[in-house]
Amino acid sequence: MIKHWINGREVESKDVFVNYNPATGEAIGEVASGGAEEVEQAVAAAKEAFPKWAGTPAKERARLMRKLGELIEQNVPHLAELETLDTGLPIHQTKNVLIPRASHNFDFFAEVCTRMDGHSYPVDDQMLNYTLYQPVGVCALVSPWNVPFMTATWKTAPCLALGNTAVLKMSELSPLTANELGRLAVEAGIPKGVLNVIQGYGATAGDALVRHPDVRAISFTGGTATGKKIMQTAGLKKYSMELGGKSPVLIFEDADLERALDAALFTIFSLNGERCTAGSRIFIQESVYPQFVAEFAARAKRLIVGDPQDPKTQVGSMITQAHYDKVTGYIKIGLEEGATLLAGGLERPANLAAHLSKGQFIQPTVFADVNNSMRIAQEEIFGPVVCLIPFKDEAEALQLANDTEYGLASYIWTQDIGKAHRLAYGIEAGMVFINSQNVRDLRQPFGGVKGSGTGREGGQYSFEVFAEIKNVCISMGSHHIPRWGV
């Protein structure tokens, strides 16, 4: 059974649920289903551990972070296998990208925590102001199911490195690697209570956690509706909300079309299309639209859909039957709205092995001649479905890109540097990638605008949620003080 990790030990619950392999439909095992009682224990443990952990020298915290990163690196094959088993993500992506990146998160933030440098502001020879970065306290880290381990470590590493303690709540759909994170943290020597892992449903464990009065900050990755609800009900806390996306890809006639094609395919179909930064709306200038669309559809048809455990697989299975139904429901909507289906669709991929007969597989699906007002272009699908939309000129491209409730990532393809800068300035998104797919640098701020969330994480931007800034004002002893009542 997969249990909770509370105060440095495994803890059971009276309630359990069954975890399933989405590629086969087979049960993996039982998972402890936490609620208010387990959350109370975890928050209490984190609160008790906080003063000592916050007072631990940064160099010692950094040493423990690096040790945890080393243990993750040593366990990459095992962790990748669990992640693929749990989520349906292709093994070549979990093993070669996601789990190694999780290890790097701890290495990177181990360095960041030793550089919590404030600023000083002298006022002539009268006063000196300086700032301190100090830990917040108990933080709730709520991680999604699509890339669970990488996202969990992306939150845990800066949180702990900066002197906070944490309660990590994983999605009930992807509990396996979170359990391993709890185990490896103990093995690394992280003091008990500093990192606690709660399993369970969002409506019970998650709700109890974000509402808890002793939780001082919330870092959440998930759907926009859930993020809004948390901010409406959890009270006065620090928030980092990385929510949904409908990211535009703008491809101009002067772009390197071959590289743009490679990047556009990768950006939508990697991670099974279940990624917040997916380039799900691809806008192509009219003069190159027919050529690009034909080549894109042909390439999409050649992608390998199949067993996530097969290193050759490029697109695995959807996470659950419910999510499969949601994605295929949008494919039906696209057909009803009059978009042109060029690849994929509702038919199951051909030549799936017998043991995958109950898996939730969807072919990479390409819709052309889409109007940006269609539901498939406006609503987050979170699967391997893409909209190809023509545009006339730069002004229309910008208008279409911004015509959405979301604003997470955006991608611009052009050789005109002036055009690239104008669009980067005008586009309503937290991140802009020019002539590139989503290439992450841990120093960069990650986050969105509008319906894609609030706050930023990454490098020193993680201080926004995981640190409090305190100002200290010192008089040199000679500044004027009004004398009242003399």
Task: List the model feature ranges, each with a label.
Residues P22-T87, S287:
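N-terminal alpha-helical segment of soluble enzymes
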Residues G118-R259, F391:
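Rossmann-like NAD(P) dinucleotide-binding subdomain of oxidoreductase/dehydrogenase enzymes
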